[in-house]
Structure formats: structure tokens, C-alpha cells
Amino acid sequence: MNRSLALFIVSIALWCASAYGQATSRDNAALVLDTLGVWRIHETLKPPVIQLDDGLKPIQSTYDWLDRETAPAPADWTSPGFADGNWLRGGARAASRTPYLANLCLRARFEVTDPAQVKDLNLSLTYYGGAIVYVNGQELVRGHLAKEGAPAMAEAYPPEAFVADDGKMLPAPNWLMEKYPKGLAARARTLANVAIPAKLLRKGVNVLAIEIVRSPYHKILDEKKNQAADKKELATRNCPYDLSWNTCELRRVQLTAAGTEGLVSNASRPKELQAWNSDILTPDYTSDFGDRCETPRPVELKGPGNGYISGKIVVGSPKAIEGLKVTCGDLKQGDAVIPAANVRVRYAVPFGHTASNSDAYGNNAAELDSLLETPLASFPATPAGKGAVVPIWLTLKAPKDAKPGLYTGQVTIEARGEKALTVPVRVEIAGFSVPDTQDYRTWVELMQSPDTLAIEYNVPLWSERHWAMIADSMRYMGEIGSRVVHIPLIAQTNSGNEQSMVRFIKKPDGTYDYDFSIMDKYLDSAEKCMGRPKFTAFIAWEIYLNTPKQEVKFTGKQDVPNHDFDREGAWLAARWELRGKGPAVTAIDPATGKLSTINLPRFEDPAARAIWKPLFDQLHQRMARRGLEQTMVLGMASDVWPNKEER
């Protein structure tokens, strides 16, 4: 690696660490709270504002819904006793990054055991816009704002924050901005080493609250409207201004002390197994940990009778979590009991090996977004989170005749070498029941993919293990009311099926017989696991049969912004190569069982009818025996239709 490149990479790494607080605090200081710690977040959204010569002007978008304002935080949000459990939970950088963010409110907790022993408690933050800091409800400091009151707007930025010395718009705030140190310096605002006096502290839980207030956009954006450093971004913009960076954003925050005397750090996970609450709509990451100052609340599940109702609790440890066992007891309301057997426990793990480099969650943090029915023998610790994290999902199948009201119970969490944790569970059953899943009025149509399962889990197509996975996936689809079964009669469609579900057997006289064994077993599984289908879609046509009117050669050139190559050209060229060929199907040799792919005559060829009509006659008979003949339809997973001759 040459020296200049090495220095460039090091400079980028140091900038990232200082910008987002992922690495260090003050020399020899104890880190009490950090950017990647546990924060509660509230956002107020409004249209962005530009400062013109005649005053402030809201920047309206082309979408009315985008301009709707959201509610401000409650007036007492800075007080220590404010209930923030319903606010977004995450690192300080998990907040929305948008020009529409008008006010950003954040709360974090830390424990003080003896205020008199706390030494050199200091706060530093970097932000865009203006900032007000509160400790236990008392204002500590503010920056780039009016000295008093609750300002709606922070100090304006100079032109250098928006345009380079050559008059061109600056790029979005990513690593490209390293080329523009003047612009970076103009944007970043800081409150550095602000001392927190002991008189603001109290024994027990203390609350640090931060409000970030937006600044207006400079009038130079009006002079440069319909211009952008990123031309691709300009093509997708819904307003004439380049709003490529946000004037209301917290970039970095650290609370440090001279040592740990008199307080307990809340910037990293504790040494023991820990549990914390997480909303089911909030993603969980391997870097997450719980708030030491917050006792886990009950896991709450709310929903109707006969419905599937979920909640979750997350556990974490600085080491691998081994022998994880979760036991849910019966749920009771007086004499009414919902048995524990109605509760399914699942365990979230990363899907594949993807990791995030987002500064919101820490480098290489992975989202825990795939559910396992049984726990791993060992949930490994990861470098990103310096430990292991396991979200535990509780899903209740509420009885159809469940008595409405509040049921209570508890879940016990055990792990090898750890003290067992007990978390209360509260289930609120509404005064109505939903229909069975196949009677939902909401139309749900998911396409089950046998080939995806075979490839993802490396199992042979149509093996017993494969059929078990198909049954599981159909069971999941049935639980949300999916009601369409797709039967590909042709192979190699853009839905990903390598084979057709009906095998074609060529007879000595040139006609065909058909092997329905795969289709029959697939329909058996669908009826058993998903429910009676409302439609059975037989797929007999595919986009590769649509031949371009003239020869197309793949150039490899870019056709659409943000595309890496000429995708449309690649598709058309591939279809040109298949010109004259009919639909691909899977053929089977009845003597050997060997499979092969053959092309039948095109549908506009009269010979095709002699092959397909007998097939559909038999399909009608077989579906009639199942009582499903009225569900039969022709289907296509394509935006392109067959031509008149093919129909």
C-alpha cells in the first residue's frame, strides 16, 4: 500500500471515530454515556425552511403527506420522572436523518451512587443546528440558539456550509466531504467539555436530556436551485433545492468523568446476563445492550381472540449465551386460563452473514432479523457488540373464545452459568375475535419458492428434508392469510423455479403423458399447512417467450441512473437468443427416472395444442377430485403479457 493511500485511510478512520464517538473518550476519562449507548428518542417533523431576503419560507414538496407536521414532545419531557418507554430506543445516531427533522429530543440515564464523589463530569457533543442540554430537568447549557426561551430556529449557517470555493454545491455528508474541510468545519457545531456541577446531580438515576433544533437553509440554495453535486439525486428530488445535508442532527455525544467513583457507567453492557424491552416494530442489532438504570417492563401483547399476537424481550451478555432456555407459564385472568402451550417462543439471529457499517449501530453490527424455532446451543459473542444478543419473540395464538380482558403470567429465561431472569407478561385480549386466517377480508398473496429453500439451506430438491421445509413455509404463509398456490407448469421462469412441477413423458408415438407426483404432493402440503386455496395459479407462460422485434446485442453500458449496466439490454439480448424456442419444461425418463429440460413448440404453433389440451383436461379432473376445480386460474409472475397469437 503506498504511503499517501495509507495516510488517507487512517485519516478517514480517525474522522469516523471522532465524529461518532465509537472509539475513545477524553484521555484517562471514564466513559459514562456514549453516542452508541441507550437513548430514548422523539422527533418532530415539519417542512424544511429556507432563509430568503424577505424572511423564512417553508420548502413545500410535491407530496402533501410529506409536509404534514408531527406532534412536539410533551412539555415535561426533560424531567427525570417522564415516562419515555414509548419513545424510539437506540443509539443517539438512530434518529431520522432528514431535512424534515425540526426538533430532536433525546434522553439517557446514568446512576450516581454518591454525588460528592463524582469528579470532572463533563459533556461534549457535536451537532448540526442548535442544542440545549438538560440535567434532571434543569437547563445546563445551550449552543447556537437564542439565550432564552424555546427557540423554533437555530442560528443560520454561512454559505460555506453549502457551496465549495468554486461555487459548486457540496456533496452529501459522506466520505467525499473529506475533500472539503472548510465545508465540514462550517457545518459541525460543538459544545466541548461542558462541566456538570454536582448540584445538578442526585443520588440514584439521573437523566441527561438533549434537544437539537434545526437551522434554516441558506438563501444560496435558492440561487443554486435545480442544481446538485449528485446529478442522480437531482433526478429523483421532489423539490428544487439541494437539501443533501440535514440542519438538525446529533453527530456525537459523550459524557465522561475523571473516574468511576460515585457513579456507574451506562456506556457498555454489564458483566452478567441482562434483559431489556424492545418494541416489535424496532429492529435489534448485535451491538445492542440494555439500560442499567431501567428495570425491564412486562412484555405486552395486545390483540383479538383467534389472532396471532407477538411481543419480545431481548437478552444480552458480554460472552456467548449457552444453553438458553425460555419457559412461559400459563396466562391467567381470574378463573380464565390461556395455556402456555398457546405461546410459541422463537429466537432471532442474523440472516446470512450481512453486517452494517452504519454509525447508528456500530461498524459490523448485524441486524437480528431471522427467527429460529429452537435456540442455538451457543449464541456467539460478536466483536461489534462485545458480547451476544438474542431477541426472544413470544407469539400467542389467542383462543377464538378467549375471555376479553387482561391476562398475566411470566417468562423465565435461563442460560448456563447465569442467574435466571423472570420477566412479567401481560396479554390484553380485545372484545372481538378475528376470522380464521383463510377467511380474512384483507387479500394476502405470497409466492412460496421451493427452489429458494433448496438453495438457501443446501438441501436436494424434493428430498424429505426439502418437503418438510416447504410445509413449514406454507404454515407461516397460512398464519398471515395467504391463499394462492402457484403451480409452474413450465421451467426456468423468473420466479426462480428450475423445474416444472408436472413432468412430461414423451411416448413412442410422439405424444406426451404426464407425471403429477410433485404437483400432487405440493397441493397436499398446501391444503394441510396453509388452508384451502382461493386460487390455484397454473403458470404456463413466461417473459422469455416474448421475442424482441429485432436483434438486440448486450452493450454493457449503463441505461438508467444508479444501475451498474444496461439491464434492459441484457434482458432483451437474452430473449433474442431464445427466439424460436417454446416453453421449457421438465421431462422424465420413466425407465431411469432421469430428468432433463426440453423446449416444447411455441404456443402459436398448432402442435402445441396437442400437448397442452390433454394436460389441462387431466388437471381439471385432478382438481375436481380435490374440490378445487373452481380455484383454477392461469397466472403469470411478469409485467409482460403474451401476444395475441400465443393466447
PLM regions and their residue ranges:
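Surface-exposed binding patches on compact interaction domains or structured appendages
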Residues: 262, 266-295, 318-394
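Accessory carbohydrate-binding/adhesion or oligomerization-edge regions at the termini
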Residues: 22-97, 109-113, 119-154, 181-265, ...
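Bacterial N-terminal signal peptides
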Residues: 6-17
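Contiguous beta-strand segments within globular domains
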Residues: 120-122, 294-319, 391
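Aromatic-lined carbohydrate-binding surfaces of glycoside hydrolases
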Residues: 367, 371-372, 377, 382, ...
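Short, surface-exposed loop/turn segments at beta-strand-coil junctions that are enriched for proline
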Residues: 113, 199, 318, 397-404
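Short, hydrophobic/aromatic beta-strand segments
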Residues: 119-123, 134-135, 320-328, 405, ...
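Surface-exposed acidic, glycine/proline-enriched linker/cap segments
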Residues: 151-194, 361-376
